[in-house]
Swiss-Prot record:
Catalyzes the base-exchange of a guanine (G) residue with the queuine precursor 7-aminomethyl-7-deazaguanine (PreQ1) at position 34 (anticodon wobble position) in tRNAs with GU(N) anticodons (tRNA-Asp, -Asn, -His and -Tyr). Catalysis occurs through a double-displacement mechanism. The nucleophile active site attacks the C1' of nucleotide 34 to detach the guanine base from the RNA, forming a covalent enzyme-RNA intermediate. The proton acceptor active site deprotonates the incoming PreQ1, allowing a nucleophilic attack on the C1' of the ribose to form the product. One of its GO terms (molecular function) is tRNA-guanosine(34) queuine transglycosylase activity. Binds 1 zinc ion per subunit. Its EC number is 2.4.2.29. This is Queuine tRNA-ribosyltransferase. Zn(2+) binds at residues 303, 305, 308, 334. The gene is tgt. It comes from Prochlorococcus marinus (strain MIT 9215).
Length: 372
């Protein structure tokens, strides 16, 4: 039911193209996943999301457990029916909230007790409970519960959290009983090569349908991010999809693909879009800026998204300056389409044998310019 088919390999790097087959369709890799934390990509309908070329989205177990609750989602027919999205969905386990809500939680080997950010009530999540929630949600891919420590933690504390992550993975595997849902394990270990190697080998030993690398882009130096991207893949199985969590910048995606990663997610396209910032190649345009008031060109003349085909920078500037909801929708749509266009261009470049780890196809001097 779940199969990862490698369709081409790059002769210059470790990049590859592939197809990840799921019960709700296939994902052509490398591929960016838009983030729909609450079973919605903020401000965008499922139909609009389809128009961007999105093939898989991410939702969050922790937040959906709090509201509306997994039982209601299951009663609706599962998360696909609930949000009217027929393509693959991956649910994050809530491990990131162990990091982001650190001041509101208490961690033990059994799980994490959270203070509900909505009403202050106490919520306990164990690895077993996290898996049961995801089984009720009915996502295509469930993530194992992991402990994502802050990047400032010392090596001993990182190692302690790693042992917890590995113990939780074993409990997740024991609990997971859903044949039409894949379970991915998560590699942790901070910036320490010894711990990353240990975690990658441990996680790989279970022969799961896919493997993720977490604890990246959580405030650490760019050099540390690149070190993990360069180092970890050599310890991961070649025949499984590799998911690099929380990465959405073009430079890091390009470097990650060059090292053999396949799937990526990030909130930046919609977070920046909601504040009026649009992607243009490797630039970011703040459309709130007065210089766009009389600019009647699209965000990107080469982009075929609905926003660029239909609206000018001047109109988007007007919407954002007047806090019109349509503005955040249109810019978010473009930003998502831009990242998907980028990963699609990478795929073409790999197949045409012109991909490099500093991929920038919008430059006319690039040998991969035809992919853009």
């Amino acid at each position: 039911m779940f199969e990862f088919e490698i369709t081409s390999n790059c002769s210059n790097t470790k990049a590859r193209t592939g197809i990840f087959h799921t019960p709700n369709g296939k994902v052509n890799t490398p591929k960016f996943m838009p983030v729909g934390t609450m079973a919605t990509v903020k401000g965008i309908s499922s139909k609009q999301l389809t128009s961007t070329g999105s093939e898989m989205i991410l939702s969050n177990t922790f937040h959906l457990h709090l509201q509306p609750g997994e039982k209601l989602v299951k009663e609706s027919g599962g998360i696909h029916n609930f949000m009217n999205w027929s393509k693959p969905i991956l649910t994050d386990s809530g491990g990131y909230q162990v990091f982001s809500l650190a001041k509101l939680n208490n961690i033990s080997d059994k799980g994490v007790e959270f203070k509900n950010p909505r009403d202050g009530s106490h919520v306990f999540l164990s690895p077993e409970k996290v898996i049961k929630i995801q089984m009720d949600l009915g996502s295509d891919v469930a993530m194992a519960f992991d402990h994502c420590p802050p990047h400032t933690a010392n090596e001993n504390d990182i190692e302690d959290s790693l042992q917890r992550t590995h113990s939780w993975l074993e409990k997740c595997i024991e609990t997971h009983q859903k044949s039409n849902q894949a379970l991915f394990g998560i590699v942790q270990g901070g910036k320490y090569p010894r711990l990353r190697e240990y975690s990658a080998k441990f996680t790989s030993s279970f022969d799961l349908p896919g493997i993720a690398v977490g604890g990246v882009s959580v405030g650490e130096a760019v050099e540390d991010i690149h070190s993990v991207i360069n180092y970890v893949p050599k310890f991961l199985p070649i025949n499984k999809p590799r998911y690099l969590m929380g990465i959405g910048s073009l430079r890091e995606i390009s470097l990650a693909v060059a090292n053999g990663f396949d799937i990526f997610d990030c909130v930046l396209p919609t977070r920046l879009g909601r504040h009026g910032t649009a992607f243009l190649n490797d630039e970011r345009l703040n459309l709130r800026n007065a210089r766009f008031k009389n600019d009647f060109s699209p965000i990107d003349k080469t982009c075929k998204c609905e926003t660029c085909k239909s609206y000018s920078r001047a109109y988007l500037h007007h919407l954002i300056r007047n806090d019109e909801i349509l503005g955040l929708t249109l810019i978010s749509l473009h930003n998502i389409a831009h990242l998907l266009r980028f990963t699609n261009a990478i795929s073409t470049a790999i197949k045409d044998n012109c991909f490099t780890n500093d991929f920038a196809p919008w430059k006319t001097s690039s040998i991969a310019h035809h992919t853009w």
